[in-house]
Amino acid sequence: MERAVPERWRLEDLWALDLPRVRFALAELTWLLDLPLWQRDGVRFQVSPNEVLRNPAGHPQHARRIAEADLTRPIHVIRRDGRWTVLDGHHRLAAAVRRQHTAVDAWLVSAADLAEITR
C-alpha cells in the first residue's frame, strides 16, 4: 500500500511550525484522492477520499468531516519524490474538490521542517 508520507510526527508539532503560507493549486494534489487515506471500522488506510465523494451515504463520518471542513484553515503540503503531498488536511482537500475550488491556502513544509518534528 502506497503511503504519501511514511514518517511519524504529531499534528501539534506540525501546527507549531512557522511556515510560509501560499495559495496552492488543487491539480497538484488530486492524485491523493484515490489513495486509501482514511479508516473504516477502526482499521487504518481503508477508504479513499474519492470513495467518500462518490458515495457519502456509505461513509457518513468522513462525509460529515468533508461537509464541515473549514477551508479558511490552510492544509499542510510537502514536496516528496517529485510531487506534492498533504501532511494535514485531507478532508479539507476533499471539501475543496467537492466545492469545485481550483486552489486552497496551504502551509509549505520543507524536508528540514518535517525532520525537525519526526520521531
Which residues fall in each region the model found?
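Short loop/turn hinge sites at secondary-structure boundaries
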Residues: 69, 100-101
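Residue-level "edge-of-site" marker
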Residues: 79, 109-110
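Glycine-centered loop/turn positions within well-structured domains
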Residues: 73, 93, 102
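N-terminal leader/domain-start detector
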Residues: 1-28
